[in-house]
Structure formats: structure tokens, C-alpha cells
Amino acid sequence: MGSGTTALVCQMQGINSIGYDVMPIADVSLKAKAACMEYDLPELRAMLEELKSLHMPDSYSLKTPCIPITQDAYPEYNERYLQFIEDWRIHCIYSENAKNLLRLCILNSLEPCSYTVKSGQYLGWDSRSPKVIHANELRAAKGKKPLSAKTVRSNILDSRDTVLLELSHVIHDLEVIQHSSQTHEKAQITYKQNSVLFELPRLPDNILKGVITSPPYCNRYDY
């Protein structure tokens, strides 16, 4: 199912679709896109304006969770703001659709405000990151050469500005979609977070008229 774009286009064209994905992020993305005709645009604009007026207190000390591979992925301010806005998102008064959309915008903003870049299955790290700096210090202490210098982007973006800009762009896109798609027939999206290896055998025979899938990648075991 991926990010759900194919299912969304099918829905807007009146075509029922069935999809699967093993990644939890697909659930966030698909729910956000499947609700494109249901969003209350004044509510989303109000949420955006409230976020613009919201500033993280200097005393806020919580940081976004990490695993070993993402340790030190963000500048210190970004690391705190990402957790701050997630806390706000969870407890805000807006609808579940609006909350999920904001969550997707936060997720879409992670890479531009980090020291990392996705490279195949791996993360590429900027030489300015604390992780690389510390690794080079350890290498120098052992008489080894530093890691090759790498800049993933010229500027590591501010997480607050990035999230606000992402949400603003999404709201604009939703305005266009809702205006241009009012006459399109609604269709059903059936989605399960699981592997096609388990789910496809459970489908009744002769219910599919077509299959859309991404091309296989040599380095992906799940293909």
C-alpha cells in the first residue's frame, strides 16, 4: 500500500481497492489520505493558526524517542520541538482526522530537519552530527583516519518552521482536491497492516480486476 496515493486516486475515480503493508507508517498515511474529502478545512486552518502562535518553553526538556540507529539524528532544539509538538498533538482538542493529518506532517518533516538522509535501506549521516563527531574522536584516539566528510544538505531546517510549512502546503492541497473532486464517486478502500503473503490467500476467488504494485528492489527482502 505504501503511502496510499494509488488507493486515494482509485477512490477519487470510483474504484474500490484492497491493499496491504507491513509498515506502521502506511496506516498513518493511508488514513490521512483516505479522509481527504472528509476534512473540515476551517478546523485545519484553525489548528494551523494555533500552532503558529504556539512556542516551546525554554524549560521544555523532553526529547523525541530514538533507537540506536537514530541517536543524535537532530539538532538539540529540533529534538525537543518534535516531542513538544507530538505531546501537543495528542492532547489537543481537534478531531482525530486532524490529529492524524498533523502526525503525517510531522513524519514528513523529520528528514529535512535532521542530520540524516535516506540512502537505500541505510541512513547517510552528516559530518556535523554529534554521532559522527564522536565517532571521529574515537577514531583519532586510535590513530585512525576520520570518516569521509559528508553534507546531507546545506542547512538543517528548523523543525517548527518545517512542520508549519508542511501543514500549510497540505491544507492548500486539500482545498484544491475537495474543490475539484466534488463530483467524483466515492469508493471503498480496504486496508490491512500485514504482509500480502498472509492476506492474499484469504481473499475470495475472482474479486480482483487488476493489480498495481511497485517494481521489485534488489536489496529488499520482502519482494
Where are the language model's segments positioned?
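SAM-dependent nucleic-acid methyltransferase catalytic core
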Residues: 82-85, 91-210, 218, 222
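Intrinsic disorder/low-structure terminal segments
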Residues: 59, 73-76, 137, 146, ...
